[in-house]
C-alpha cells in the first residue's frame, strides 16, 4: 500500500515512556537484538558517548527499518501496542527462536490469528506490547 501524497512524511518513530532508559536499552539490545543509535542526558543537555557512565534519559534504538525512541518517565504512558511487520512467516519464526533463546518476554508464540495473519506478541519491561506480524504460509503449489 503506497500512501505517498507528496506531503513529505516518510517515517514514524514511536516514543516509548520507560521507567529506566538504561534498563530498556539493555533489554532491547540483549534480548531483542536492537542496536543503540544515540543517547541523551536531559540533565546535562548533551548527547552521551557510547559506554559513558552518565545515565541517559533518552535514546534511539533500532533494528532493520524499525526505530523507537525511549524516554524516561515522560512523553506518554507506558503500555502501548506497536505493530511490527516482517515479510515472511520464516522471518517471524526466526525472531521467535532468537528472542526465546534471549529470554524475551514472549506473551503469545507465533500462530495464525482469526484475521488470517501469522503473529506473535512480545512485551518489554514497561508493558509495551510488540505485535510482530507476517502473512500466513501459502500451500505448496498455490499461486
Where are these regions (language model features)?
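Core segments of cupin and vicinal oxygen chelate
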Residues: 6-8, 15-66
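Residue-level detector of high-confidence beta-strand sites
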Residues: 37-39, 109, 132
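Conserved beta-strand in the GNAT
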Residues: 68-71, 121, 130-131
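A short acidic/small-residue loop/turn micro-motif
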Residues: 75-76, 114-115, 135-139
